[in-house]
Amino acid sequence: MAEQVLVGDVGGTNARLALCSLQDGSLSHIKNYSGAEYPSLEAVIRVYLEETAAKVSSACIAIACPITGDWVAMTNHTWAFSQSEMQQNLGLQHLSIINDFTAISMAIPALKDEDKIQFGGEAAQAGKPIAVYGAGTGLGVAHLVHSGEAWMSLPGEGGHVDFAPNSTEEVMVLEALREELGHVSAERLLSGPGLVNIYRGLVLSDDRVPENLQPKDVTERALADEDIDCRRALSLFCVLMGRFGGNLALNLGTFGGVYIAGGIVPRFLEFFKASGFRVAFEDKGRFHSYLEPIPVFLITHEQPGLLGSGAYLRQKLGYKL
């Protein structure tokens, strides 16, 4: 039996853990745990190892927060821990704690054709830079570059760059939201809560009072064609996803492709396909022709965070991806 390592994908609500084969990166024994039911990440890992009777010497856990040193404090959870202490407590020879979008970016080289849907552009160019972003609870961003024999993820907090409007409607939304929020980042519009902000901004810019809606309300009403404001909001969301993706492509010349990680887009996939997303992606004036061949993909793999955590660790331990 091939040696296995522990991999994880931890968000503000759930912790997903699995075993990953060092030989081929395949995943097994995938389990999901509610973070609210455990006092710490270490406690969840101990339960998982006991339930699976797994013996591992190495682990890689992806977490939805910035990783800047030994101490890790989750953004949307009370869990906080020292990486070195947890490694020692669990008796691991190696422990890597990485950002969730570092993991998702590292999953991309392992994706098969059936794990993604293409939106325009030509074939991805092998070995060229890649960008990945995803709108969920927040807006995650990472880049991936090939260096020598290895893939290198370039994580950051790109979701918090300034929102840059590019139409009269977008300027009006920005002005309405600025009065409520102060600084308006891209994440304030490109996320689940951001979809509601777009709806609010559109209604407020018309000098009307918005309803108190949740993201799913906006999506459901838009798809049912029951509410013109919600439909406008969802349409603008798709356009802004395109503009933001085009900006990422320009930043690093991502002829290896721009990837959208799951998040909320799959909930309205057909609407997204028919939206102004791709036109907005290429809408860069003189650089339209530069962006035209760059493909955009939606990741449909169910566990890209786990897959990427495994890929990150396998490469770190000397395995070629």
Swiss-Prot record:
UniProt KW keywords: ATP-binding, Cytoplasm, Glycolysis, Kinase, Nucleotide-binding, Transferase
Keyword Cytoplasm among UniProt keywords: yes
Protein location: Cytoplasm
EC number: 2.7.1.2
Domain of life, per lineage: Bacteria
InterPro entries: ATPase_NBD, Bacterial_glucokinase, Glucokinase
Top-tier EC class: transferase
A GO molecular-function descriptor: ATP binding
Catalyzed reaction equations: D-glucose + ATP = D-glucose 6-phosphate + ADP + H(+)
Residue positions binding ATP: G8, D9, V10, G11, G12, T13
Protein name, entry field: Glucokinase
Organism: Tolumonas auensis (strain DSM 9187 / NBRC 110442 / TA 4)
